[in-house]
């Protein structure tokens, strides 16, 4: 009895060594995709840390957390409602997202050089990289049904986190420690 070929498999017809690297040549590579992120529909969201403080963009264009009742969230919607664009990912690593805010102009969160800042830009429709400073992987936290974490696609093992600096609770990028770090956990309340 002959085995039936599976639809999601690639048949290889040849192997080549080039500069000490083994390459496989596919019989038909029409359906193969290069690594990229393709933009899907956005969600309007309010992001909170575990102290129930709301993430917002202050006058200095910094992402900070503050105590804020729901009525103030609505009144300050341009600074408190984030646009989370989801992206189709050619690899399976979690839900690929960008985090933007529309305060006068569109700005998108970047972790370039492991420092968070908002770049004045709209997220592009396609990103032809395996890792990018504006793409984060949104994942649920095991054992916490309503908690989310965001891992940088550019810096594996680095997550968005809340850190107290002086009197401010800031959004930062930090390497995850293995001791149940709660500073990297957030709740995301979708508005649409």
Swiss-Prot record:
Propeptide residue interval(s): 1-35
Gene behind the chain: IL18
Localisation per UniProt entry: Cytoplasm, Cytosol; Secreted
Species of the source: Sus scrofa (Pig)
The protein, known as: Interleukin-18
GO biological process entries: angiogenesis; cellular response to lipopolysaccharide; cytokine-mediated signaling pathway; defense response to Gram-positive bacterium; establishment of skin barrier; extrinsic apoptotic signaling pathway via death domain receptors; immune response; inflammatory response
Ribosomal protein listed as a keyword: no
Function in brief: Pro-inflammatory cytokine primarily involved in epithelial barrier repair, polarized T-helper 1 (Th1) cell and natural killer (NK) cell immune responses. Upon binding to IL18R1 and IL18RAP, forms a signaling ternary complex which activates NF-kappa-B, triggering synthesis of inflammatory mediators. Synergizes with IL12/interleukin-12 to induce IFNG synthesis from T-helper 1 (Th1) cells and natural killer (NK) cells.
Gene Ontology cellular-component annotations: cytosol; extracellular space
Entry keyword annotation includes Cytoplasm: yes
Keywords (A to Z) from UniProt: Cytokine, Cytoplasm, Inflammatory response, Secreted
Binding partners and assembly: Forms a ternary complex with ligand-binding receptor subunit IL18R1 and signaling receptor subunit IL18RAP at the plasma membrane. Mature IL18 first binds to IL18R1 forming a low affinity binary complex, which then interacts with IL18RAP to form a high affinity ternary complex that signals inside the cell. Interacts with cargo receptor TMED10; the interaction mediates the translocation from the cytoplasm into the ERGIC (endoplasmic reticulum-Golgi intermediate compartment) and thereby secretion.
GO molecular function annotations of the record: cytokine activity; interleukin-18 receptor binding
């Amino acid at each position: 009895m002959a085995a039936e070929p599976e639809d999601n498999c690639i048949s290889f017809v040849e192997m080549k060594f080039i500069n000490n690297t083994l390459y496989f040549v596919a019989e038909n590579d029409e359906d193969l995709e290069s690594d990229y992120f393709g933009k899907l529909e956005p969600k309007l969201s309010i992001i909170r840390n575990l102290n129930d403080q709301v993430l917002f963009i202050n006058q200095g264009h910094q992402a900070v957390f503050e105590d804020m009742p729901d009525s103030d969230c609505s009144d300050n919607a341009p600074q408190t409602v984030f646009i989370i664009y989801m992206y189709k990912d050619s690899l399976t690593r979690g839900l690929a997202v960008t985090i933007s805010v529309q305060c006068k102009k569109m700005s998108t969160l970047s972790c370039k050089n492991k420092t968070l800042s908002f770049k004045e830009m709209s997220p592009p429709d396609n990103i032809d990289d395996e890792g990018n400073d504006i793409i984060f992987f949104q994942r649920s936290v095991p054992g916490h049904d309503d908690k989310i974490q965001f891992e940088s696609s550019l810096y594996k093992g680095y997550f968005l986190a809340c850190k107290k600096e002086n009197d401010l609770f800031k959004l930062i990028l930090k390497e995850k420690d293995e001791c149940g770090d709660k500073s990297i956990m957030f709740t995301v309340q979708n508005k649409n």
